[in-house]
């Protein structure tokens, strides 16, 4: 008797669990989104970050190139009739971003990998407006952008009869942020603006107020968005504004603001050398002392066009376990590791089993290398032997969107198969579904296909008849080839079971867990379950169910439900009995 409990991991807190007995059937059902997860090598993307991509252009902008991007293209294009929906993808290498420290700035690439070393940055003097001009160049993307008139935020002009007028920006010694803007006429304070929050947190608010003062005029710089947080203003002392408009400056604040949405670089202001701290304070207490040392930021100076450096792609780690954990609770269902390493396949098998046992059903599709022998494939299957893992045997060539021919090892073909199965309705089998392969490295004979299929290995066969030639998937077997338990040996039926029991579990928990038994009767729960199964039957997700077999018993604080379901099966065999007879013609 084959039984499976969902979730398998014992739970002591209030919950619902479902026991599935699949001994009465020999294996399928219908429609919902099955999110595909891919992990592999790429030229772009932040390490340890899972990206959700919905189209190829978006994927290319993130991952740039590499096996991961090719796998995404295969998942969406190996059979246009059935393509994956959104894809969750992550690069596996611990890549590093390039950097540049120059002119008082630290420039860090937002692109991770060696390609980021080709980004160039320059900070130049604009002598016409007494400001700075920033250039960012990345020739590989034909990108060049200029940020001009940086540093000038708003001007202040005093037009009154006083002999002297000045403004000052005072900084907090501890935070190194602007704290007060002070206007003076003839050494007398006219007004002081508190800049660390409150009514004058942004420069627009200061300008509005200054223009209400007699004989003062303030104007925002007309170049770009200059409405900065006022705490980012640069320090200034007694700047003469008698009869002339002089700019209040915020060089780094303006650079940071203008480039905040730049997709290539980000900026930090460097501190003065740590060996020469200023404003050292010691606060002694009875049993301890606190030492505070503040370094002023470096002055920002112009510098010539310079390349960033230090970006590296890194290598895939020996173990992918920590990387796989990033896909927890992301909502993925199928996951494909883009590697032929058996140790990683075992880690993926453990990962999907653990997630499924915890109540988040997942499945994996893995593949080997190029032109692997049957014996090696049998060895891979024997090590895996997992009802939640499928193994793809074939490697081959695909024509990609840009016209190039991709030599795809079996683990890349696995991404194409995963894209196909993700695009099918829940419980629909990939058996005999065509795959748009240009050629296979090894075309198996009929006996070999039978042998591989019986051992739980997915294969692709070449079909030629009078009307068409194509490549199609032989069967939807898992690496657990027990024909007596099709829920475990067939991908489609196992998938249908996952979605059916996980949805029923959630609905029962939402509807009944925590309710008082005086308000809940066995007949109510029975009606609820029958209604749910009736809906699934109408949606073609189950074949049928006997309503009289739905039984509910409530004893104490526990409800026990038993039911029988006839699943929708994928037709696997057709037998035709054909008899020829001789016709006698006479006249």
Swiss-Prot record:
It is found in: Virion; Host cytoplasm. Signal peptide: none annotated. Disulfide bonds: none annotated. One of its GO terms (cellular component) is host cell cytoplasm. InterPro entries: Phage_sheath_subtilisin. GO terms for biological process: symbiont genome ejection through host cell envelope, contractile tail mechanism. Transmembrane segments: none annotated. It comes from the Viruses. Keywords: Host cytoplasm, Viral contractile tail ejection system, Viral genome ejection through host cell envelope, Viral penetration into host cytoplasm, Viral tail protein, Viral tail sheath protein, Virion, Virus entry into host cell. The keyword Ribosomal protein does not apply. Homomultimer. Polymerizes as an extended structure around the baseplate-tail tube complex. During ejection, the sheath shifts to a contracted form, thereby making the inner tail tube protrude through the host cell envelope. Belongs to the myoviridae tail sheath protein family. This is Tail sheath protein. It comes from Staphylococcus phage Twort (strain DSM 17442 / HER 48) (Bacteriophage Twort).
């Amino acid at each position: 008797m084959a039984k499976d409990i969902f979730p398998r991991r014992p739970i002591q807190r209030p919950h619902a669990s479902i026991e599935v007995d699949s001994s009465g059937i020999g294996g399928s059902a219908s429609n919902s989104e099955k999110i595909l997860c891919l992990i592999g090598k790429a030229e772009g993307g932040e390490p340890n970050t899972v990206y959700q991509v919905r189209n190829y252009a978006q994927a290319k902008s993130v991952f740039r190139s590499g096996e991961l991007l090719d796998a995404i293209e295969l998942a969406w294009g190996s059979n246009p009739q059935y393509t994956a929906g959104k894809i969750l993808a992550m690069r596996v290498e611990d890549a590093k971003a390039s950097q540049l420290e120059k002119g008082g700035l630290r420039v860090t690439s937002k692109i991770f990998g060696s390609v980021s070393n080709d980004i160039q940055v320059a900070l130049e003097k604009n002598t016409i407006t007494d400001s700075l001009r920033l250039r960012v160049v990345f020739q590989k993307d034909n990108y060049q952008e200029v940020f001009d008139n940086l540093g000038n935020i708003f001007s202040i002009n005093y037009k009154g009869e006083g002999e002297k007028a000045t403004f000052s920006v005072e900084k907090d010694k501890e935070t190194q942020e602007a704290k007060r803007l002070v206007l003076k006429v003839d050494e007398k304070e006219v007004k002081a603006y508190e800049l660390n929050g409150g009514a004058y947190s942004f420069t627009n608010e200061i300008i509005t107020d200054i223009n209400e003062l007699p004989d003062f005029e303030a104007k925002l710089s007309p170049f770009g968005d200059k409405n900065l947080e006022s705490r980012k203003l640069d320090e200034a002392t007694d700047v003469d504004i008698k009869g002339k408009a002089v700019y209040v400056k915020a060089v780094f604040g303006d650079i940071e603001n203008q480039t905040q949405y730049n997709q290539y670089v980000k900026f930090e202001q460097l501190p003065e050398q740590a060996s020469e701290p200023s404003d050292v304070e010691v606060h002694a207490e009875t049993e301890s002392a606190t030492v505070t040392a503040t370094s002023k930021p470096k002055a920002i100076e112009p510098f010539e066009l310079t390349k960033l450096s230090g970006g590296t792609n890194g290598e895939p780690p020996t173990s992918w376990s920590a990387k796989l954990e990033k896909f927890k609770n992301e909502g993925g269902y199928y996951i494909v590791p883009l590697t032929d390493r058996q140790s990683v396949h075992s880690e993926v098998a453990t990962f999907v089993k653990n997630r499924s046992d915890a109540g988040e059903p997942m499945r994996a599709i893995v593949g080997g290398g190029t032109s692997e022998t049957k014996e090696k494939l049998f060895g891979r299957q024997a090590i895996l032997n997992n009802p939640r893992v499928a193994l793809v045997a074939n490697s081959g060539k695909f024509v990609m969107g840009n016209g190039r021919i991709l030599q795809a090892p079996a683990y890349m073909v696995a991404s194409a198969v995963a894209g196909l199965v993700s695009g099918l309705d829940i419980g629909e089998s990939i058996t005999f579904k065509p795959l748009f392969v240009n050629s296979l490295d090894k075309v198996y004979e009929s006996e070999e296909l039978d042998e591989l299929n019986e051992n739980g290995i997915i294969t692709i066969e070449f079909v030629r008849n009078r009307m068409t030639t194509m490549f199609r998937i032989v069967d939807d077997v898992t690496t657990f080839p027990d024909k007596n338990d099709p829920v475990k040996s067939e991908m489609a039926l196992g998938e249908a079971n996952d979605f059916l029991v996980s949805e029923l579990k959630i609905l029962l928990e939402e509807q009944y867990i925590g309710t008082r038994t005086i308000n809940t009767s066995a007949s109510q729960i029975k009606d609820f379950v029958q209604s749910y199964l009736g809906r699934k039957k109408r949606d073609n997700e189950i074949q049928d169910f006997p309503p009289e077999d739905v039984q509910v018993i409530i004893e104490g604080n526990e409800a026990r439900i038993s039911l029988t379901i006839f699943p929708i099966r994928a037709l696997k065999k057709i037998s035709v009995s054909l008899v020829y007879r001789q016709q006698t013609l006479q006249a």
